[in-house]
Amino acid sequence: MKSENQIHTALYLAFQRSQWAELRESVPLTLNEPELANLRGINEKLSLTEVTDIYLPLSRLLNLIVGAKQKRGLVLNEFLGRKPPKRPYIISIAGSVAVGKSTTARILQALLSQWPEHPRVDLVTTDGFLYPLAELKRRGLLQRKGFPESYDMKLLVEFISNIKAGAPYVEAPLYSHVSYDRITDDHQAIESPDILIIEGLNVLQTSQDAAVGTQQPFVSDFVDFSIYVDAQEQLLKKWYIDRFLQFRGGAFSDENSYFHHYSKLNDKEAKITAANIWDSINGPNLKLNIEPTRDRAHLILQKGDDHLMSQVLLRK
Protein backbone atom coordinates (compact mmCIF):
# COMPACT_ATOMS: atom_id res chain seq x y z
CA MET A 1 0.00 0.00 0.00
CA LYS A 2 1.32 3.42 -0.92
CA SER A 3 2.20 5.80 1.91
CA GLU A 4 0.57 9.20 2.27
CA ASN A 5 3.78 10.88 1.05
CA GLN A 6 3.87 8.69 -2.08
CA ILE A 7 0.25 9.55 -2.85
CA HIS A 8 0.94 13.27 -2.41
CA THR A 9 4.00 13.01 -4.67
CA ALA A 10 1.92 11.33 -7.36
CA LEU A 11 -0.96 13.79 -7.17
CA TYR A 12 0.56 17.11 -6.15
CA LEU A 13 3.35 19.57 -6.79
CA ALA A 14 4.85 20.42 -3.39
CA PHE A 15 6.07 23.91 -2.54
CA GLN A 16 7.90 24.85 0.62
CA ARG A 17 6.90 28.21 2.04
CA SER A 18 9.81 30.13 0.46
CA GLN A 19 9.23 28.51 -2.95
CA TRP A 20 5.54 29.37 -2.91
CA ALA A 21 6.23 32.96 -1.84
CA GLU A 22 8.34 33.51 -4.97
CA LEU A 23 5.27 32.86 -7.13
CA ARG A 24 3.68 36.10 -5.97
CA GLU A 25 5.64 38.01 -8.64
CA SER A 26 4.40 41.60 -8.72
CA VAL A 27 0.97 41.19 -7.12
CA PRO A 28 0.58 44.16 -4.74
CA LEU A 29 -0.43 43.83 -1.10
CA THR A 30 -3.75 45.66 -0.83
CA LEU A 31 -4.51 44.92 2.84
CA ASN A 32 -3.26 47.00 5.75
CA GLU A 33 -2.92 45.97 9.38
CA PRO A 34 -6.31 47.33 10.59
CA GLU A 35 -8.09 45.55 7.71
CA LEU A 36 -6.23 42.33 8.48
CA ALA A 37 -7.20 42.58 12.16
CA ASN A 38 -10.86 42.51 11.12
CA LEU A 39 -10.29 39.33 9.11
CA ARG A 40 -8.38 37.33 11.73
CA GLY A 41 -10.06 34.47 13.53
CA ILE A 42 -10.04 33.85 17.26
CA ASN A 43 -6.60 32.85 18.57
CA GLU A 44 -4.88 33.28 15.18
CA LYS A 45 -1.68 35.25 14.64
CA LEU A 46 -2.08 35.91 10.93
CA SER A 47 0.39 38.58 9.82
CA LEU A 48 0.84 40.67 6.70
CA THR A 49 3.92 38.53 6.02
CA GLU A 50 1.69 35.44 5.94
CA VAL A 51 -0.67 37.20 3.55
CA THR A 52 2.24 38.23 1.33
CA ASP A 53 3.97 34.83 1.29
CA ILE A 54 0.95 32.52 1.07
CA TYR A 55 -2.23 34.30 0.07
CA LEU A 56 -0.95 36.68 -2.60
CA PRO A 57 0.51 33.84 -4.72
CA LEU A 58 -2.76 31.93 -4.21
CA SER A 59 -4.74 35.00 -5.24
CA ARG A 60 -2.62 35.27 -8.40
CA LEU A 61 -3.13 31.58 -9.20
CA LEU A 62 -6.89 31.80 -8.74
CA ASN A 63 -7.08 34.96 -10.84
CA LEU A 64 -5.34 33.14 -13.70
CA ILE A 65 -7.60 30.09 -13.35
CA VAL A 66 -10.80 32.15 -13.18
CA GLY A 67 -9.64 34.16 -16.21
CA ALA A 68 -9.04 30.97 -18.19
CA LYS A 69 -12.52 29.71 -17.27
CA GLN A 70 -14.08 33.00 -18.34
CA LYS A 71 -12.27 32.90 -21.70
CA ARG A 72 -13.35 29.32 -22.29
CA GLY A 73 -16.92 30.35 -21.58
CA LEU A 74 -16.71 33.14 -24.16
CA VAL A 75 -15.38 30.74 -26.79
CA LEU A 76 -18.10 28.19 -26.05
CA ASN A 77 -20.82 30.84 -26.15
CA GLU A 78 -19.58 32.11 -29.51
CA PHE A 79 -19.54 28.59 -30.89
CA LEU A 80 -23.07 27.88 -29.65
CA GLY A 81 -24.36 31.31 -30.64
CA ARG A 82 -25.93 32.03 -27.29
CA LYS A 83 -25.63 34.35 -24.33
CA PRO A 84 -26.19 32.28 -21.16
CA PRO A 85 -26.72 33.77 -17.70
CA LYS A 86 -23.70 34.84 -15.69
CA ARG A 87 -22.36 31.85 -13.77
CA PRO A 88 -20.10 32.48 -10.77
CA TYR A 89 -16.82 30.65 -10.35
CA ILE A 90 -17.22 28.53 -7.21
CA ILE A 91 -14.35 27.94 -4.76
CA SER A 92 -14.76 25.63 -1.76
CA ILE A 93 -12.66 25.68 1.40
CA ALA A 94 -12.70 22.60 3.64
CA GLY A 95 -10.88 21.46 6.76
CA SER A 96 -11.26 20.64 10.42
CA VAL A 97 -12.83 22.62 13.20
CA ALA A 98 -10.27 25.16 14.53
CA VAL A 99 -7.94 24.92 11.50
CA GLY A 100 -8.73 28.43 10.30
CA LYS A 101 -11.01 27.82 7.30
CA SER A 102 -13.06 30.93 7.95
CA THR A 103 -10.00 33.17 8.13
CA THR A 104 -8.63 31.68 4.92
CA ALA A 105 -11.99 32.30 3.24
CA ARG A 106 -12.18 35.92 4.43
CA ILE A 107 -8.60 36.66 3.32
CA LEU A 108 -9.21 35.20 -0.13
CA GLN A 109 -12.47 37.10 -0.46
CA ALA A 110 -10.68 40.36 0.34
CA LEU A 111 -7.79 39.69 -2.05
CA LEU A 112 -9.75 38.27 -4.98
CA SER A 113 -12.17 41.20 -4.93
CA GLN A 114 -9.24 43.54 -5.68
CA TRP A 115 -8.75 42.04 -9.15
CA PRO A 116 -10.65 44.03 -11.82
CA GLU A 117 -11.66 40.83 -13.65
CA HIS A 118 -13.83 39.64 -10.75
CA PRO A 119 -14.56 42.45 -8.27
CA ARG A 120 -17.65 40.88 -6.72
CA VAL A 121 -16.73 37.98 -4.43
CA ASP A 122 -19.31 36.55 -2.02
CA LEU A 123 -18.63 34.21 0.90
CA VAL A 124 -21.09 31.68 2.30
CA THR A 125 -20.52 29.32 5.22
CA THR A 126 -22.30 25.98 5.39
CA ASP A 127 -23.13 26.59 9.08
CA GLY A 128 -26.44 28.10 7.98
CA PHE A 129 -27.38 24.80 6.36
CA LEU A 130 -27.17 22.84 9.60
CA TYR A 131 -30.57 21.58 10.62
CA PRO A 132 -32.24 23.89 13.15
CA LEU A 133 -31.56 22.99 16.78
CA ALA A 134 -35.06 21.60 17.33
CA GLU A 135 -34.72 19.33 14.30
CA LEU A 136 -31.29 18.11 15.43
CA LYS A 137 -32.79 17.23 18.81
CA ARG A 138 -35.73 15.47 17.15
CA ARG A 139 -33.36 13.37 15.04
CA GLY A 140 -31.03 12.65 17.96
CA LEU A 141 -28.14 14.42 16.21
CA LEU A 142 -27.24 17.13 18.72
CA GLN A 143 -24.03 15.33 19.68
CA ARG A 144 -23.20 14.85 15.99
CA LYS A 145 -23.49 18.48 14.97
CA GLY A 146 -21.01 19.07 12.16
CA PHE A 147 -21.19 15.47 10.95
CA PRO A 148 -22.57 15.14 7.38
CA GLU A 149 -25.98 13.92 8.56
CA SER A 150 -26.51 17.10 10.60
CA TYR A 151 -26.77 19.23 7.45
CA ASP A 152 -29.85 19.82 5.34
CA MET A 153 -28.10 18.55 2.21
CA LYS A 154 -31.19 18.98 0.05
CA LEU A 155 -31.30 22.69 0.90
CA LEU A 156 -27.53 23.10 0.48
CA VAL A 157 -27.42 21.37 -2.91
CA GLU A 158 -30.47 23.32 -4.08
CA PHE A 159 -28.71 26.55 -3.09
CA ILE A 160 -25.42 25.80 -4.85
CA SER A 161 -27.10 24.35 -7.94
CA ASN A 162 -29.09 27.57 -8.33
CA ILE A 163 -25.85 29.54 -8.03
CA LYS A 164 -24.18 27.32 -10.62
CA ALA A 165 -27.14 27.70 -12.99
CA GLY A 166 -26.73 31.48 -12.92
CA ALA A 167 -29.82 32.41 -10.91
CA PRO A 168 -29.70 36.21 -10.43
CA TYR A 169 -30.87 36.06 -6.80
CA VAL A 170 -30.40 33.22 -4.32
CA GLU A 171 -30.90 33.24 -0.54
CA ALA A 172 -28.60 31.45 1.90
CA PRO A 173 -29.67 30.77 5.50
CA LEU A 174 -27.67 32.41 8.28
CA TYR A 175 -26.38 30.89 11.51
CA SER A 176 -25.98 32.40 14.98
CA HIS A 177 -23.01 31.29 17.05
CA VAL A 178 -24.71 32.91 20.04
CA SER A 179 -27.93 30.87 19.90
CA TYR A 180 -26.12 27.89 18.28
CA ASP A 181 -28.99 27.77 15.80
CA ARG A 182 -30.14 28.81 12.35
CA ILE A 183 -31.51 32.35 12.19
CA THR A 184 -35.15 32.18 11.15
CA ASP A 185 -35.90 35.84 10.33
CA ASP A 186 -32.90 36.78 8.18
CA HIS A 187 -30.86 35.47 5.27
CA GLN A 188 -27.85 36.26 3.08
CA ALA A 189 -28.69 37.49 -0.41
CA ILE A 190 -26.42 36.28 -3.22
CA GLU A 191 -26.87 38.35 -6.38
CA SER A 192 -24.76 37.24 -9.35
CA PRO A 193 -21.25 37.39 -7.87
CA ASP A 194 -18.20 36.84 -10.07
CA ILE A 195 -16.85 34.36 -7.53
CA LEU A 196 -18.60 32.49 -4.72
CA ILE A 197 -16.50 31.05 -1.89
CA ILE A 198 -18.26 28.35 0.12
CA GLU A 199 -16.60 27.30 3.37
CA GLY A 200 -17.41 24.30 5.54
CA LEU A 201 -16.35 21.03 7.10
CA ASN A 202 -17.75 18.66 4.49
CA VAL A 203 -17.69 20.52 1.16
CA LEU A 204 -15.26 18.01 -0.40
CA GLN A 205 -17.52 15.02 0.13
CA THR A 206 -18.62 13.02 -2.92
CA SER A 207 -20.96 10.11 -3.61
CA GLN A 208 -18.16 7.80 -2.42
CA ASP A 209 -18.85 9.04 1.11
CA ALA A 210 -22.61 8.47 0.99
CA ALA A 211 -24.45 5.52 2.45
CA VAL A 212 -24.82 2.52 0.16
CA GLY A 213 -27.79 2.99 -2.15
CA THR A 214 -27.83 6.77 -1.72
CA GLN A 215 -27.91 8.70 -4.97
CA GLN A 216 -27.76 12.45 -4.65
CA PRO A 217 -25.58 15.32 -5.89
CA PHE A 218 -23.02 16.83 -3.52
CA VAL A 219 -21.57 20.32 -3.10
CA SER A 220 -18.34 19.09 -4.68
CA ASP A 221 -20.21 18.36 -7.93
CA PHE A 222 -20.69 22.11 -8.43
CA VAL A 223 -17.28 23.39 -7.30
CA ASP A 224 -14.68 24.68 -9.77
CA PHE A 225 -11.68 24.83 -7.41
CA SER A 226 -11.31 23.26 -3.97
CA ILE A 227 -8.95 24.09 -1.11
CA TYR A 228 -8.26 22.01 2.00
CA VAL A 229 -6.65 23.64 5.04
CA ASP A 230 -4.63 20.92 6.78
CA ALA A 231 -2.82 20.45 10.10
CA GLN A 232 -1.81 17.58 12.36
CA GLU A 233 -4.51 16.53 14.80
CA GLN A 234 -2.48 17.32 17.91
CA LEU A 235 -2.22 20.93 16.70
CA LEU A 236 -5.91 21.06 15.84
CA LYS A 237 -6.88 19.81 19.29
CA LYS A 238 -4.57 22.34 20.95
CA TRP A 239 -6.00 25.17 18.84
CA TYR A 240 -9.54 24.05 19.65
CA ILE A 241 -8.82 24.09 23.39
CA ASP A 242 -7.11 27.49 23.13
CA ARG A 243 -10.07 28.86 21.19
CA PHE A 244 -12.50 27.42 23.74
CA LEU A 245 -10.63 29.29 26.48
CA GLN A 246 -10.88 32.50 24.46
CA PHE A 247 -14.61 32.00 23.97
CA ARG A 248 -15.09 31.27 27.68
CA GLY A 249 -13.98 34.80 28.51
CA GLY A 250 -15.63 36.34 25.46
CA ALA A 251 -18.59 35.01 23.48
CA PHE A 252 -19.67 32.52 26.17
CA SER A 253 -19.97 35.33 28.73
CA ASP A 254 -22.99 36.67 26.82
CA GLU A 255 -26.05 35.62 28.85
CA ASN A 256 -27.86 34.85 25.59
CA SER A 257 -25.16 32.41 24.50
CA TYR A 258 -26.17 28.77 24.22
CA PHE A 259 -22.85 27.99 25.91
CA HIS A 260 -23.12 30.59 28.67
CA HIS A 261 -22.72 27.87 31.33
CA TYR A 262 -19.17 27.28 30.10
CA SER A 263 -18.21 30.85 31.08
CA LYS A 264 -18.27 29.80 34.74
CA LEU A 265 -15.60 27.09 34.32
CA ASN A 266 -12.12 27.63 35.71
CA ASP A 267 -9.07 27.02 33.51
CA LYS A 268 -8.68 23.37 34.45
CA GLU A 269 -12.39 22.60 34.01
CA ALA A 270 -12.49 24.47 30.68
CA LYS A 271 -9.49 22.57 29.29
CA ILE A 272 -10.96 19.21 30.33
CA THR A 273 -14.36 20.11 28.84
CA ALA A 274 -12.84 21.27 25.54
CA ALA A 275 -10.65 18.17 25.31
CA ASN A 276 -13.68 15.94 25.91
CA ILE A 277 -15.67 17.74 23.19
CA TRP A 278 -12.76 17.25 20.80
CA ASP A 279 -12.33 13.58 21.65
CA SER A 280 -16.04 12.76 21.41
CA ILE A 281 -17.18 14.94 18.50
CA ASN A 282 -14.63 16.97 16.53
CA GLY A 283 -11.84 14.39 16.51
CA PRO A 284 -14.03 11.50 15.29
CA ASN A 285 -15.65 13.74 12.67
CA LEU A 286 -12.19 14.72 11.43
CA LYS A 287 -11.03 11.11 11.12
CA LEU A 288 -14.25 9.68 9.68
CA ASN A 289 -15.53 12.40 7.37
CA ILE A 290 -13.23 15.38 6.87
CA GLU A 291 -9.64 14.18 6.57
CA PRO A 292 -10.50 11.34 4.11
CA THR A 293 -11.63 14.01 1.61
CA ARG A 294 -8.37 15.98 1.78
CA ASP A 295 -6.69 14.46 -1.28
CA ARG A 296 -9.62 15.41 -3.50
CA ALA A 297 -8.70 19.09 -3.14
CA HIS A 298 -7.06 20.99 -5.96
CA LEU A 299 -4.83 22.70 -3.40
CA ILE A 300 -3.81 21.82 0.17
CA LEU A 301 -2.55 24.45 2.60
CA GLN A 302 -0.53 22.69 5.30
CA LYS A 303 -0.17 24.49 8.63
CA GLY A 304 2.45 24.08 11.30
CA ASP A 305 2.86 25.71 14.70
CA ASP A 306 1.19 29.07 15.37
CA HIS A 307 -1.18 28.59 12.42
CA LEU A 308 1.63 29.42 9.96
CA MET A 309 1.61 27.73 6.56
CA SER A 310 4.57 25.40 6.10
CA GLN A 311 3.82 23.83 2.70
CA VAL A 312 1.47 24.20 -0.24
CA LEU A 313 0.41 21.22 -2.36
CA LEU A 314 -1.01 21.98 -5.82
CA ARG A 315 -2.67 19.21 -7.77
CA LYS A 316 -0.84 18.38 -10.99
Swiss-Prot record:
Acyltransferase in keyword set: no
Assigned EC number: 2.7.1.33
Binding annotation for ATP: G95, S96, V97, A98, V99, G100, K101, S102
Enzyme class name: transferase
A GO molecular-function descriptor: ATP binding
Keywords: ATP-binding, Coenzyme A biosynthesis, Cytoplasm, Kinase, Nucleotide-binding, Transferase
Location(s) in or outside the cell: Cytoplasm
Known catalytic reactions: (R)-pantothenate + ATP = (R)-4'-phosphopantothenate + ADP + H(+)
Pfam families per the UniProt record, alphabetical: PRK
Pathway assigned in UniProt: Cofactor biosynthesis; coenzyme A biosynthesis; CoA from (R)-pantothenate: step 1/5
GO BP, sorted A to Z: coenzyme A biosynthetic process
Entry GO terms, CC: cytoplasm
HAMAP family, per database record: Pantothen_kinase_1 (MF_00215)
Family: Belongs to the prokaryotic pantothenate kinase family.
This protein's name: Pantothenate kinase
Name of the gene: coaA
